[in-house]
Amino acid sequence: MSLFNKITKTFQWGQHTVTLETGEIARQSGGAVIVDMDGTVVLATVVAAKNPKPGQDFFPLTVDYIEKTYAAGKIPGSFFKREGRPSELETLTSRLIDRPLRPLFPEGFYNEVQVVVHVLSLNPEASADIAALIGSSAALAISGIPFNGPIGAARVGYINGEYVLNPGPTQLADSKLDLIVAGTEAAVLMVESEADQLPEDIMLGGVVFGHEQGNIAVRVINELVREAGKPEWQWTPPAKDEDFIAKVNGLGEAKLRAAYQIRSKQDRTQATRAAYAEVLAALAAEGAAVDKVKVENLLFDIEAKIVRSQILAGEPRIDGRDTRTVRPIEIRSSVLPRTHGSALFTRGETQALVITTLGTERDTQRIDALAGEFEDRFMFHYNMPPFATGETGRVGSPKRREIGHGRLAKRALIPVLPKKDEFAYAIRVVSEITESNGSSSMASVCGGCLSMMDAGVPLKAHVAGIAMGLIKDGNRFAVLTDILGDEDHLGDMDFKVAGTTTGVTALQMDIKIQGITKEIMQVALAQAKEARLHILGKMVEALGGAKEELSVFAPRLYVMKINPEKIRDVIGKGGATIRALTEETGTQINIEEDGTITIASTDGDKAQAAMKRIEEITAEAEIGKVYEGPVTKILDFGALVNILPGKDGLLHISQIAHQRVEKVTDFLTEGQIVKVKVLETDEKGRIKLSLKALLERPEGYVEEERPRREYGDRGDRGDRGRDRGDRPPRRERGDAPQAAPESDVPSPQAE
């Protein structure tokens, strides 16, 4: 009898065959599912604590997506030869899984839940992120943990006017869209996408298509749950103390309503903190035991009720705007004197100082990914220090949120970047958030675009981003343009759209409630387009296009092409030639396999000097051309003369002067500079030179004729120090040497 009660479900999903399996591996976890998607295999596990920690006031969900290098048949390249800290892709995929799962846990469920996904095998044409999403959903669904799932997920491409389900990297190279959708059978929960300036209706169609295809996975997971699901937890939300809630409402609602009449974020924050403190003090004065966390949660609920009811009633928002107005915008470029490009983008109380730095090929980011190594010449880094929100906190390496926001901004800008052959620089953009009150990632998109244009990067178009919010109560809803931080915290959706006047370049949506409808997404996209066009108008006013001149502090790139067979000449033995060249000229030189050479320098004269040297190194000697160079070596039969860098030609003794030359040293010395003419070159690159061809012939000089040899001219034999013509006539083949009179003894030749 088998140890395992293995349950397997297999289904065809577009071009992929997918298998879900449970019951054999990781049986001590709360739920474990292996997903095999055409050779990409992931193990998704979930474990939940049986009880919440005392005083816990939030839901502690952690998701860790871990790629094992053995999945691609590799050994880690680190010193310790094992996997280390998460890569950027692992962090982004962990967030991708977390976002659609989090809103499906019931309110009040504060038990710690940990989802861990291991990539065990990787087929590069079947991306592991979709398999990881499906596996995480299935593991939670069979675990019995309180969870209002399962969810499905799908990747959508757009190739030749048609949507494509779960395209691999090869197909994505030809796709105008890379979109991931996740949601329950009823509604969409999460969208993450990058697009090549596509119109809103194509984007919405992609979301709907992806949701429909994701439901195929939902139905299979439900079948798996029916056969392999564990008993549901006997969990009930904590009972509400209605009398205590009424008391807190009575003490705090009026104070909080007054606080939310204040338009300034800092003043409003101080007022709400004061209201919290007064309510806690009043409760303490009554002598009752006060659970601070419980009271603060109730006061937060009051805040949400106030803000949401005002908006749904058509009243002004927190800062006095209506639902469609964008906050005031201020833009300044060339903010920093010695950076290559910079811009300060301010929208209301959100501000981004964005800096662009241009680099060379050596500055590109080399990424050793599981699917293979590649170089990335465009980097976007987002930083938000605690002072941006008037708080204290940890400063150091980027957190998951910062990595995610940087990636979103990068996605928005990639479609408008120039091609490498148009602009060969490596580009690094850093967004420093100096103030934050909502939508700092979209401020980073706007500032990043302006900063690159200030640096002279020839972008195809301006790109702007806007964050939309949602307040939904039953069938009533309001979509908010350019949300504040409080509206984000108290609302139901964070919907970010970036793009040009032509179309959308990036879209990200996170839902806090259990899904939104197609109608709401249509309204949000239309409203976002209106706001985006408004912001783009402001950006064009501030900076109409990319500067034509780069900063004087930016490196200049000079590109030249050489014969690929000459690459080794430029590099030299052990890299000696190119190393000396870079040190002498102070430039950076990069050589590609096709013979393209890129020279980087902040000094144009130095770059030109390097180009000249390379031209000389790779130059071919031209027959009939006169060169000047030093004598590098004296030989018995002539001399070697350096006519080009790394190229010596032979000046034969017979080509030194019109008169007979007995000793080369009578005419030449090592180091002597002479002018010579190229007589000929051969297929091996050997060069024959002449000095006498440039000298005047002496009066009455007659070129000495030399007899032709019977078996063809084998060239000069200068190593004998004289002409072959001085020799006596050669014996005919078979002639015997003159010897004694004939005898009867046969000669050796006669035998």
From Swiss-Prot:
The keyword Magnesium applies. Its cofactor is Mg(2+). Residues 624-692 form the S1 motif domain. It catalyses: RNA(n+1) + phosphate = RNA(n) + a ribonucleoside 5'-diphosphate. The keyword RNA-binding applies. Signal peptide: none annotated. Residues 555-614 form the KH domain. Mg(2+) binds at residues 488, 494. One of its GO terms (cellular component) is cytosol. Residues 700-751 are annotated as: Disordered. Involved in mRNA degradation. Catalyzes the phosphorolysis of single-stranded polyribonucleotides processively in the 3'- to 5'-direction. NCBIfam families: polynuc_phos, PRK11824.1. This is Polyribonucleotide nucleotidyltransferase. It comes from Methylibium petroleiphilum (strain ATCC BAA-1232 / LMG 22953 / PM1).
